[in-house]
Amino acid sequence: MTDVRLTSLTKTYPGEAGAALDALTLDIPSGSLTALLGPSGCGKTTAMKMIAGLLSPSAGDVTFDGQSVLNDPPEARGAVMVFQNHLLFPHLSVADNVGFGLRMRGRPKAEVRDRVAEILGRVRLPDLGPRMPSELSGGQQQRVALARALVLRPKVLLLDEPLSNLDAHLRLEMR
């Protein structure tokens, strides 16, 4: 796990009045569960994208364990983001979607297969590996997206409304 610190994190866009995120300062201790709460448009997703390296801040800093990560590419940060709208590859099976990041990192096929099977079991989808995303419910697709993030064993896991498509029972189980 990793200590995350946001210092005066700000994001402005040219031609827009005000900041999308204005001087957010936050310490997130290693191993903790932290929720960013607020109304739509207040900058929660913007902050997470900057932590993950998917968006550059206009000002401020993001540090992991005391080291700035602003110049690190997203894949080198060890932060993974799960988006509300899944972003699954429609032409890949569930198993291939979950194992995609491992394959891109050059992991051996046997390791990819074993870790994908393990994580699909953890998100309660052990038999859906051969299926295509279009054959899944919204809640199942959300769990595949979560599995795709978890299989990488990230230092920082960022979840943008990850439980929104799950029924009440599954929501409790996935927590």
Model segments located where?
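The feature captures the beta-strand-to-loop junction immediately N-terminal to the Walker
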Residues: 37-39
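ABC ATPase nucleotide-binding domain helices that frame the ATP-binding cleft
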Residues: 45-48, 144
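Conserved coupling/switch loops of ABC nucleotide-binding domains, chiefly the family-specific signature
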Residues: 58-61, 111
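Conserved ABC transporter NBD signature motif
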Residues: 60-68
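Helix-to-loop junction immediately C-terminal to a conserved catalytic motif
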Residues: 52
